[in-house]
Amino acid sequence: MVSLMTSFVVETFVPGGSQDRFTADVDGIRLAAEAHVAVEGRVHHVRSYLVPGDEMGFHVIEADSIELVARVTETAGIEVERIVEAVSVEPGRVADDAMEGAS
């Protein structure tokens, strides 16, 4: 059985909310993730979001560890505000905790 990777959100500052700059950052993360897979373990860029009005970029990365995510962003030359673990809740699913609170 294959174990699931942990999801992380990488928060970055994108000066001026530049889509060109953000696209370059995303390309860098994808290339760095591919390079690290061959050497260090499992890491996968899932998706990225730019919030131009706030000059913020958010990258969802699945990996075996937060340290691996940090190495990927460093290799990509991305200046990171923070990296945090994230939990995905799929549409139509109700968490066990929510069900317990409803009774």
What are these regions (language model features)?
Residues M1-A38, R42-H44, V51, S88-S103:
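Short S/T/G/P-rich N-terminal loop/turn motif that feeds into the first structured element of a domain
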Residues F8-T12, V46-L68, V72:
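Short, well-ordered beta-strand segments in beta-rich or mixed alpha/beta enzyme
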Residues V37, E62-V89:
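An amphipathic, aromatic/His-enriched active-site/gating alpha helix that lines ligand/cofactor pockets
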